[in-house]
Amino acid sequence: MAIPFKVLIIGGGVAGLTLAIMLEAYGFDYELLEKHSDVAPKLGAGVGLTPNGARILDQIGVWEMMCERSSPVDSGTALSPEGRTVIFNPNMGEWLQKLFGYKIHFLSRHDCLKILFNKIQQKSRVHLLKEVIKIEAGNLGEKGYVETKDGSIYTGDIIIGADGVRSSVRRELWRIADSESPGYIPKQDKTGIVSFYTAVVGIAYNSGLPEGGSARAYNHHRSYFFQEGREGSGEFYWWLCAKNEKTKEGVIPKLSSEVKEGLLNKYKNDQIGPDLTLGALYKSSIYSTVIPLQEFVLQKCFYKNILLIGDTFRKLHPVAGQGANSAIEESAFVADMLWDLRERGALHDPDSIQKALTEFQTERVVRTTALREDANLVQRMESLDNPVMKFMALKFIPRLNFVIAFLPQLGSSFTPARHLKHLRPPKVGLCPFSQDMKAKPLPRSPLATFSWVTVLILAASSPWLASKYFISGARSFTDDQASQLAEVLELYISILSVSISGMWVIESYKTSSLISPFTSSLPWILASNFWGWQKILPIYICFYILSSQSVVYYYMPQTMTDLGVAKALLPALLVVYTVSAVCTINESGGNTDNSWWFTADFAFPVVAYLSGMFLNATSTMPQAVDVVFSTIDIPYQRRFQNTIAFVGFVAYAALASQYGTTILNEGLNLLNIPAVKNLASLTTVTTLWCLYSAWELRRINATGTSVIRAWLTILSSTIFGGPAATLAGTFIWSKVELAKATSFHPTMQSTDTL
């Protein structure tokens, strides 16, 4: 007979109620304690439900009811401080549904909580007016005890704290941990609760704001957000987020009405629409309040059998709309965790529970830290925090393509999310979520990043160090022979530069490169031809390694955003470099002159871009989301890189057949020749880059090839096929592997679903 197991949930908000529904669906015993007299008071701001939360709500059977009481976000608008439209996209809702299966919906917090509460089958397990005052934690696998203000005692095998920012459970967890295990709770967890902004939130009727979408208004050190409530109701929710004069630390008590009135009077003349000011909006409001916007992510969210979720564990700035959705994700994680422990008969096994809770903590800290950083960046930009943010918000970003600049960033906040593994799978769109992918991106450790960058710098400088300290200076061939070898090697370096510039061009068309040092390949090519490829390539790769260490990086589309350019890669390559080769031969009279190759390096990205524009304008091909969020460009990349690899191999074979014996005999003494030194540096750097790429793919589980096998293949290819062919081959291999690993993959779905 199975040993009884009870979950004790503290808090009847979004996190607590969704967890209760999931536990009922999974057949777990539970009780829920809520300190207020009503789980769905008619107070508070609205709730935005994004695809990552919507798909879980769909699984537990409440999504349709949520939609009936909500308004879909069909469009997106951003306004300048003068009330002028700087961004408008009427297709946002349609695109989100196509990509992720669900639109964003917005409804009142009251309706959201009421729908969740009504879904609970055994309402006798929900106890109101039960304010927690003391907890006695049990060891893992044992029971814990909770005492409420009215003297009641409740027990549970695991205690889930979901009682919000001002959490009694968190306070008790810290008290117990500090008493029993001093130092377990990091100092940062207690001092890292901060507030940079204060918000006034309100509900207005028939305010004159546009229906059917969300709107944001930018202003100096403040911003606004507006959203229709239930569709057709005339109800609008609005937020004023104002930057505090000083950063506030610690859990902040409720703010007074004087603070609210002060902010409203200070900004009453702000233009938040063509014919609407904040003062006029406030006059049409039936409800308003002021709240401190606190932000934190705890590094420790459990101790013994107490686990924190929702706003008890982390608090995000509401500008990104991920607070409630993250709570839903965490509830799903906990429910699946308990199901899996039960399936293994490990609900009372301390080691198994410890491992499961540690996995929860690790994954959720990474996920919510990324969400917090993204939300903070968005708020700083919308409140024009400094001249750079002001320029980005009002001048630069409005000129960017919405599909390329906004949707991938928005999607990267959705797709790392989980869903319930043991209920009917949710609807899907073009974009897979984390459980649908083979790849399992994790943030790269700072130590690993530092190590790769350090080794890369040492590798790039190794030929210079070797030439200075390890060569004798004597060689057995004449200066004329050395000059001929140098000319041939310069020609091979030119071919290697084609492989490098081809990689740079492709990377410049990725969504993650849009606002980065990689947004254009031309500056890198210009610098390489001026200062040398052997000096610029290591800098590029160091920047690349540093910029790709976040987990969000791999949830962005990894392929090219312009199908026309992808199709034009190979034709542009053949035309530009064939012309360059012919001109070089005709003008040199048999001597190698690389000036035409330099011209070709500049011309290639320009010709590819112009050819792509022509193809997009004159032929029918997929556009917008059907390109950016697909792998349709991969075959064109493959042909392009295979051509470079073939030419690079032929050139290397010709070089090896003519000078291979000389190079082997002379060894390091050849480093006296600058061309040899440059090629040696480029070879070590490109080889190390290929080794890093293989290691990184394996680290995120994007390839089944072992690191040792991949490295041996890369080293063998470099020796026998040359660095140009190896770089091109490794680059396209990594692109194909990553594209497959971040596309839909057969989900490890339990056959025992409900």
From Swiss-Prot:
Taxonomic superkingdom: Eukaryota
Binding site for FAD: 34, 48, 109, 311, 324
Enzyme class: oxidoreductase
Transmembrane segments: 3-23, 446-466, 486-506, 536-556, 563-583, 595-615, 644-664, 679-697, 712-732
Keyword Transmembrane helix: yes
Pathway: Secondary metabolite biosynthesis; terpenoid biosynthesis
Membrane topology qualifier: Multi-pass membrane protein
Pfam short name (any one): FAD_binding_3
Active site: 218
Cellular component, GO, one term: membrane
Glycosylation sites per record: 586, 616, 701
Keywords, comma-separated and alphabetical: FAD, Flavoprotein, Glycoprotein, Membrane, Monooxygenase, Oxidoreductase, Transmembrane, Transmembrane helix
GO biological process: terpenoid biosynthetic process
Cofactor(s) required, per the database record: FAD
InterPro entries xref list: FAD-bd, FAD/NAD-bd_sf, FAD_mOase_fung
Main subcellular location of this protein, as a coarse class: membrane
EC number: 1.-.-.-
Localization annotation: Membrane
Gene Ontology MF terms in the entry: FAD binding; monooxygenase activity
Function: FAD-dependent monooxygenase; part of the gene cluster that mediates the biosynthesis of the meroterpenoids nectripenoids A and B, as well as cochliquninone D and isocochliquninone E. The pathway probably begins with the HR-PKS ntnH that catalyzes two chain-extension steps to form a reduced triketide, which then primes the SAT domain in the NR-PKS ntnG to initiate three more cycles of extension to give a linear hexaketide corresponding to the polyketide part of nectripenoids.
Family: Belongs to the paxM FAD-dependent monooxygenase family.
Record protein name field: FAD-dependent monooxygenase ntnA
Organism annotation: Nectria sp
